[in-house]
């Protein structure tokens, strides 16, 4: 009997569907990956968020044949030395574009209009006005040209913004005014009013946003990171924020998560923090189930080549 370990906060939603659709499988659930590790030796299949894996955990999964990441990112899995070469890896790529684009706008509007200050004034019953920054006419630079960037670009255009892209292989993409290679990131960053990081994480991309890139940005520019914490040199970012070399940042991801309570980021007036939730939406579950169902059927019927979002390793 195929044993499926579903280690995710939404496992209890999907487990009955799996049992009903595939009655011949055994389903074990856990609220998250750490709590599920003792069950790793039993698992033929693991479904979990893509960022919680490491060599020590994967080494326990001796029967493992397939991992499905309940996220777009899979760097913590694919980069593991303990992952056998024959283990199948799939992701939930394709469902997060609209909500992550909306989160980028939440950051841009809040930072540009200084909404935290407005909200604080409301609580204090203070009537105060200041010059507002509008998005119309501003330049947004987006690193990483996947489905999320393709969802964000037309929304930026609808706001009257100039949209520049940074990617490994520059090419014409609808919604983008101009493309740059990663080797030209410093040049692109100098043009940005908003630099939005959507690049997939890899060792080669670690600290993509570093002191050099931050120094190239305008003093009035904002950095948004919705991808992975490892893409940003956090020490360099803290220095740039403290010394007002950039205007502020919207950060959904960090190198250490949850963000430690003692982190200086928490107390910075020019930083907006969210808890790695930019991909969340009220219809994620409904959009995810068809991917899981299709891939499970393909896996059980040995049609692995037909699985959705199959990662080539």
Where are these regions (language model features)?
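Glycine-rich NAD(P)-binding loop of Rossmann-like domains
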Residues: 118-151, 178-179
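N-terminal glycine-/charge-rich "phosphate-binding" loop or analogous flexible N-terminal tail
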Residues: 1-45
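Phosphate/diphosphate ligand-binding glycine-rich loop within oxidoreductases
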Residues: 44-119
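C-terminal helix-to-coil terminal segments
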Residues: 90-103, 117, 257-313
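Residues forming the Rossmann-fold NAD(P)(H) cofactor-binding site
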Residues: 98, 149-150, 211
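NAD(P)-binding Rossmann-fold cofactor-contacting core
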Residues: 158-175
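Short, well-ordered coil/turn residues at beta-beta hairpins
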Residues: 7, 49, 70, 198-201, ...
């Amino acid at each position: 009997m195929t044993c499926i370990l579903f280690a995710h906060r939404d496992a209890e939603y999907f487990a009955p569907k799996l049992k009903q659709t595939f009655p011949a499988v055994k389903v074990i659930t856990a609220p998250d990956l750490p709590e599920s590790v003792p069950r790793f030796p039993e698992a033929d299949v693991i479904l979990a968020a893509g960022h919680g894996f490491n060599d020590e955990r994967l080494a326990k999964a001796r029967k493992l044949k397939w991992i499905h990441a309940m996220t777009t990112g899979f760097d913590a899995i694919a980069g593991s030395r303990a992952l056998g070469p024959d283990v199948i890896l799939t992701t939930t790529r394709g469902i997060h574009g609209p909500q992550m684009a909306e989160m980028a706008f939440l950051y841009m509007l809040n930072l540009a209009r200084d909404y935290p200050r407005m909200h604080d004034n409301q609580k204090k019953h203070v009537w105060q006005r200041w010059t507002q920054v509008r998005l119309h006419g501003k330049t947004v630079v987006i690193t990483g040209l996947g489905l999320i960037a393709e969802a964000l670009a037309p929304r930026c255009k609808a706001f009257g913004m100039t949209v520049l892209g940074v990617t490994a292989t520059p090419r014409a993409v609808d919604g983008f005014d101009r493309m740059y290679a990663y080797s030209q990131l410093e040049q692109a960053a100098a043009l940005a009013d908003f630099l939005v990081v959507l690049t997939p994480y890899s060792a080669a991309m670690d600290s993509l946003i570093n002191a050099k890139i931050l120094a190239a940005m305008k003093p009035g520019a904002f950095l948004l990171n919705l991808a992975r914490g490892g893409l940003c040199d956090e020490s360099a970012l803290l220095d740039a924020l403290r010394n007002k070399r950039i205007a502020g940042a919207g950060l959904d991801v960090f190198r250490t998560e949850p963000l430690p309570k003692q982190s200086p980021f928490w107390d910075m007036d020019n930083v907006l923090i969210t808890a790695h939730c930019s991909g969340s939406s009220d219809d994620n579950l409904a959009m995810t189930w068809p991917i899981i169902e299709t891939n499970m059927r393909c896996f059980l019927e040995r049609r692995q080549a037909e699985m959705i979002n199959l990662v080539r390793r």
